[in-house]
Amino acid sequence: MIKKLSLYTFALLGTLVLFNSCKKEYESVETLDTRSIKEYLAKNNIPENMDPSGFYYQIINPGTGAAVANTDSVYYTYDFKHADGTSITKNGDYTIPGTFLGYTDRFSFLTIPAVRITLGKLKKGGAARVILPSRMAFGKNGLTALGVESNEIIVIDLTLPLFNNQVEVDNFLINKFITANSLQVTTDPTRVRYIISAEGTGKTDLKETSKVNVKYTGRFLNGTTFDSSTDGVTFTLNELIPGWYKVMPGKIGTGGKIRLIIPSDLGYGQSSQTDGMGTVTIPGNSCLDFDIEIVSITN
């Protein structure tokens, strides 16, 4: 009986030791997070505002537009950073995501409620910063692919721009692109911007229903090429995206060269384009930049 009791006692003590060690490990991570965050706040003169869920935040600009709820469609920007300010990942320079506020916490690598909660504290036009404890971010494993270390706190800069629809977003991004690249463009009534470098011959021959042989390069606004043909390929013009067939007729002829900067609704719209393997080649709501040369026209 004594032997059995001793074995039981030792087993119980072992369980308690294991439980306490786990508890201490958790508490040590929490303590480490708190110390790292307080050091960051002090260094950057940021007040200690802690959300009840455990993350810290700073309202940089509360915004002057409408308040937002989880069921509202919003446009937002994000920049995940190390505590030293180095960017980890962010929305692209020429990408502004839009979705329901309730879905803004969903990223390909993690779901982060702190993003949704903090955006919900803003009005449109606002900006905020989230200081995320490691246990609410990438934890003790970190994320090697993004260069995040074990138990590293993460800073997330957020904005809630004053855009009401995709047309406003596209106009903003295209104007930003034009300014950044010092382009001299003409704006078509369709909102497509264009630059004609060579008119070619017989520009009145080019109609929406024409068969055209073209050489072209298609890029995103960040300069990445998504499609091209240097040998020439034949299409019926009105079977292509509206940004081509609504703009090109009457502007260039055979041998003509034009650059088109196309809003997303005159490109592929909200739908992502995929290749034969299902890989996204053109994300939805992408503005596009084309260089086009007309090799021949057939009516």
Q: What do the PLM-derived regions correspond to, one by one?
A:
Residues I2, S6, C22-N299:
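Cross-family detector of peptidyl-prolyl cis-trans isomerase
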Residues V17-S21:
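C-terminal motif of bacterial Sec signal peptides marking the signal peptidase cleavage site
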Residues L5-L16:
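Sec-dependent N-terminal signal peptides
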